[in-house]
């Protein structure tokens, strides 16, 4: 195989890898959104627990919005 042919094959492999990667990223957007919702729920529960703890509340009043 000549150098030109090897370079062409290399470019085709890179192009194919890029296309597969791009299309698989687009398909995972819904799954990523669901994971972010779960993470925000976990953070909310953690903050609520902190707001009921007086020392933690004192350090994080901005997050507790004045509620205990």
Curated annotation (Swiss-Prot):
The cysteine framework is I (CC-C-C). Alpha4/7 pattern. It is found in: Secreted. It holds the Pfam family Toxin_8. Disulfide bonds join 50-56, 51-64. GO terms for cellular component: extracellular region; host cell postsynaptic membrane. Expressed by the venom duct. Belongs to the conotoxin A superfamily. Alpha-conotoxins act on postsynaptic membranes, they bind to the nicotinic acetylcholine receptors (nAChR) and thus inhibit them. Residues 22-48 form a propeptide. This is Alpha-conotoxin-like Mr1.2. Residues 1-21 form the signal peptide. Residues 52-54 are annotated as: Ser-Xaa-Pro motif, crucial for potent interaction with nAChR. The modification Asparagine amide is found at residue 65. Keywords: Acetylcholine receptor inhibiting toxin, Amidation, Disulfide bond, Ion channel impairing toxin, Neurotoxin, Postsynaptic neurotoxin, Secreted, Signal, Toxin. One of its GO terms (molecular function) is toxin activity. It comes from Conus marmoreus (Marble cone).
